């Protein structure tokens, strides 16, 4: 089974890349195949709401979304990490989420995939829960199965994430829960 991690930060090598890496390491240790999307490396233009994707299986905007669509389609689970920018995730991740409407219009391509969210803020109560709830909203819109970390919403860290031992534990627990649910689904399919 495959888990795709999406680092929603426009900043390279920072906290989101570190927490998505930690989460995917848990998945690898459990035997999952992993893949990543680093929004900092991708060119994703905002949706124009042109409606062209209603009638075709591609977006008319020529950027990196075609590769991202394929990574999301190929995944059994998707874990998204986002920093808090003004109380929510950054515009670059919003563009990716908006453009994912193509996958919804094409028979709910993300339906029943398992999703989880991670967030990092500048302080312990820096908007991470709101950011995670917004990511969960996107997942629910796609009909995904959403999991948390067994305590609240998902993996919540503060800057610098790798020094936040409590936060990094929530990242690990969120990844474990994602893996647990995927394994349960697989066991049910194998019956």
From Swiss-Prot:
Free-text cofactor note: Binds 1 FMN per subunit.
Binding of [4Fe-4S] cluster, residues: 47, 50, 53, 59
A GO molecular function held by the record: 4 iron, 4 sulfur cluster binding
Subunit structure: Homodimer.
Similarity comment text for this entry: Belongs to the SsuE family. Isf subfamily.
Cofactor: FMN; [4Fe-4S] cluster
Described purpose of this protein according to its UniProt entry: Redox-active protein probably involved in electron transport during fermentation of acetate to methane.
InterPro entries listed in its UniProt record: Flavoprotein-like_sf, FMN_Rdtase-like_dom, ISF_SsuE-like
Additional free-text comment from the UniProt record: The electrons derived from oxidation of the carbonyl group of acetate flow from ferredoxin to the 4Fe-4S cluster and then to the FMN cofactor.
UniProt effect for mutating residue 59 to A: Formation of a 3Fe-4S cluster in place of the 4Fe-4S cluster
Organism from which the protein derives: Methanosarcina thermophila
Keywords, alphabetical: 4Fe-4S, Flavoprotein, FMN, Iron, Iron-sulfur, Metal-binding
Family annotation (Pfam families): FMN_red (PF03358)
UniProt name for this protein: Iron-sulfur flavoprotein
Effect of residue 47 to S: Modified 4Fe-4S-cluster properties in electron paramagnetic resonance
Signal peptide: none
